[in-house]
């Protein structure tokens, strides 16, 4: 597993405002989108490209375009949806799938899958899993293996904040045959007894969309 933690003053500034409990949902959503675009620049560094002959107004040349099959972006519902706009603005030609998973509150590293909208065959596809928080790591491992069951061998996870416990769990449980990378804005101190990241930013889904009782 490859882990990349962004080190940039803009990321630090935006992340500080994002964490602030007084930041309203409207600003929170904008900041998530902006942070994801900064992360995506790093996460997409190794996208497959092919030669593309074109003509400029001055002369013919050979440039590069994204190769087929197109990469696929997979937000983990519901909080991952808040990251989708930033990803599609950077990669408008990418396909988008959806995966609904939630943590079993009695068994934090176990996941319940309640929805999916994905191609049956992901062979040869570069997959980008997006979810704001990497807490216990259970959701990320389960989601990655879900993609791998459909043939995915190249998976990049984009998370805003991670906990050390989650990173360790992912390192220990991810299938080593998968080319796997994690890009985060920050690795925080720890998980608390409720498996929330500390200092974290609270419940990302609630802060993006409001609390659902």
From Swiss-Prot:
Task: Note the InterPro entries from the entry.
Answer: PRibTrfase_dom, PRTase-like, Upp_B, UPRTase/APRTase, Ura_phspho_trans
Any idea which positions bind uracil?
A: 197, 202-204
Query: Which reaction is this enzyme known to catalyze?
Result: UMP + diphosphate = 5-phospho-alpha-D-ribose 1-diphosphate + uracil
One Pfam family named in its UniProt record: UPRTase
Fetch the CDD domains from UniProt.
PRTases_typeI (cd06223)
Q: Which UniProt keywords apply?
A: Allosteric enzyme, Glycosyltransferase, GTP-binding, Magnesium, Nucleotide-binding, Transferase
As to how many cofactors bind and how, the note says: Binds 1 Mg(2+) ion per subunit. The magnesium is bound as Mg-PRPP.
The reply on keyword Transmembrane is: no
State if Nucleotide-binding is listed as a keyword: yes
**SUPFAM superfamilies, per this entry?**
PRTase-like
Identify the EC number(s).
Answer: 2.4.2.9
A single BP term in Gene Ontology: uracil salvage
Q: Where, in this chain's numbering, is 5-phospho-alpha-D-ribose 1-diphosphate bound?
A: 78, 103, 131-139, 203
Q: How is its activity regulated?
A: Allosterically activated by GTP.
Q: Example GO molecular function term?
A: uracil phosphoribosyltransferase activity
User: Which cofactor names does the annotation list?
Assistant: Mg(2+)
Where on the tree of life does the source sit, at the highest rank? Bacteria
The EC class name is transferase
Main function: Catalyzes the conversion of uracil and 5-phospho-alpha-D-ribose 1-diphosphate (PRPP) to UMP and diphosphate.
Which NCBIfam families does the annotation name?
PRK00129.1, upp
Task: Show the PANTHER family listed in the entry.
Answer: ADENINE PHOSPHORIBOSYLTRANSFERASE, URACIL PHOSPHORIBOSYLTRANSFERASE, CHLOROPLASTIC
What family does the entry list? Belongs to the UPRTase family.
Name of the molecule in the record: Uracil phosphoribosyltransferase
Please state the gene responsible for encoding this protein: upp
């Amino acid at each position: 597993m490859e882990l990349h933690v962004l080190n940039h003053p803009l990321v630090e500034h935006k992340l500080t405002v994002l964490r602030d409990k007084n930041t309203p949902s409207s600003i929170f959503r904008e900041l998530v989108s902006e942070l994801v675009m900064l992360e995506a620049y790093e996460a997409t560094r190794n996208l497959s490209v092919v030669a593309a002959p074109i003509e400029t107004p001055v002369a013919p040349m050979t440039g590069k375009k994204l190769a087929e099959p197109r990469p696929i972006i997979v937000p983990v519902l519901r909080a991952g949806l808040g990251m989708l706009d930033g990803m599609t603005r950077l990669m408008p030609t990418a396909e988008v799938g959806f995966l609904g998973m939630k943590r079993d509150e009695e068994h934090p590293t176990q996941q319940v899958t309640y929805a999916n909208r994905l191609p049956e065959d992901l062979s040869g596809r570069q997959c980008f899993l997006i979810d704001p928080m990497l807490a216990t790591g259970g959701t990320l491992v389960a989601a990655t293996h879900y993609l791998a069951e459909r043939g995915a061998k190249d998976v990049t996870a984009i998370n805003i904040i991670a906990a050390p416990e989650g990173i360790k769990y992912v390192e220990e449980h991810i299938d080593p045959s998968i080319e796997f990378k994690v890009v985060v804005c920050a690795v925080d101190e720890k998980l608390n007894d409720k498996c929330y990241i500390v200092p974290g930013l609270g419940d990302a889904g609630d802060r993006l969309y409001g609390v659902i009782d």
